[in-house]
Amino acid sequence: MTHYHFVGIKGSGMSSLAQIMHDLGHEVQGSDIDQYVFTEKALRNKGIKILPFNPDNIEKGMTIIQGNAFSDTHEEIVRAHELDLEVIDYPTFLGHVIEQYISIAVTGAHGKTSTTGLLSHVMNGDKRTSFLIGDGTGLGIPQSEFFAFEACEYRRHFLSYHPDYAIMTNIDFDHPDYFKDVDDVTNAFQEMAYNVKKGIVAWGKDEHLRKIKADVPIYYYGLEKNEDIYADNIQITEHGTQFDVYIDGKYFDQFLSPQYGDHNILNTLAVIMVCHLEGLDIENIKEALETFGGVKRRFNETKLHNQVLVDDYAHHPREINATIETARKKYPNKEVIAVFQPHTFSRTKAFLEEFAESLSKADRVFLCDIFGSIREHDGSLTIQDLIDRIPGAQLIGENNVNILNEFDNAVILFMGAGDIQKIERAYMENNGVTNEF
């Protein structure tokens, strides 16, 4: 048994990894900022100690896992080196963990967390599968055969992994503080492709993914009949989305997903293909798919009188489009109200016009102040720059959430990667409801 200390344990990936190591019988603790983050609920439920940052947390005999947001000058990392302890960064450590399993990496600019959550749930319907999801959920199952995990492209962290399979959902320009342009992102994915040992499952309609070369087979999925696996005869029902699946041009089976939206069909196709390649029992897969309840902060719904409140991580124009599309398909008779908090000044500046265009697809738009990352300070851009580009958009904060009460028959989308949940929480509390995210 190893004693692990996670520096930045409330980070979504770090929280998941800490839970996995705890489940596998190791002694685990960690440190982070003294502020509530939704990831800590799962940690506390498993009895994992969360400490405020302090060099005294670091003791002899520990192995230190260093979160991506923390440099070698962090006080706890400095103390670890003074004690001559082993310090391993998050992606390197995760790369070591996956080596003992048949591993499936899920990567892409959008859809990683939802697809990883679906993959882990569905595979566990037939085979023991440990998993690491980017919503702060992790589970280490003893004697697992498979390991499903989210692999982030930011700063090329995913190059630390050599998975058996990779699901590549899409390539898009994001993280403008690191990547120069979409070609730079594509080059990173190309490097990742050469790390894959068995096969790549990629969205066939993505022009950038179509350029990827690999030393293993690439299987394309989509809604077009020229793909290796595709969906046809799509029907939206009160229970979800039903569709037929074809593999190599031949009818495979009919599936029912409890989710809505084309992006969720695509995610499901990718998962089905991986299961098919590994020979999992199709009836078990179908049954597990029908019971998938989603992942944290991905279209999580709460009913409030005649309103549906949705908590969603969407923080890129393309993700906002998908979230609004899902709301319209699932609730065609309700207004769609967008409450959005931009995440990072660099992303807001890079996609200012695209944010305005995507948000304008909602019936009404409310915007929160920009949530800056710990790495940046940029006063040259304000939320007013985005408000001015969206007709009728208004500023919203915890002190004026009651304005949302006027939308009686509506889906209210609270979107963002920062602390947008405080706005939804304030609105619910003002309506006499408490909710712990």
Curated annotation (Swiss-Prot):
The gene is murC. Belongs to the MurCDEF family. It is found in: Cytoplasm. Cell wall formation. GO terms for molecular function: ATP binding; UDP-N-acetylmuramate-L-alanine ligase activity. This is UDP-N-acetylmuramate--L-alanine ligase. It comes from Staphylococcus carnosus (strain TM300). Its EC number is 6.3.2.8. Its main location: cytoplasm. It comes from the Bacteria. One of its GO terms (biological process) is cell wall organization. Keywords: ATP-binding, Cell cycle, Cell division, Cell shape, Cell wall biogenesis/degradation, Cytoplasm, Ligase, Nucleotide-binding, Peptidoglycan synthesis. Coiled coil: none annotated. It catalyses: UDP-N-acetyl-alpha-D-muramate + L-alanine + ATP = UDP-N-acetyl-alpha-D-muramoyl-L-alanine + ADP + phosphate + H(+). GO terms for cellular component: cytoplasm. ATP binds at residues 108-114. Pathway: Cell wall biogenesis; peptidoglycan biosynthesis.
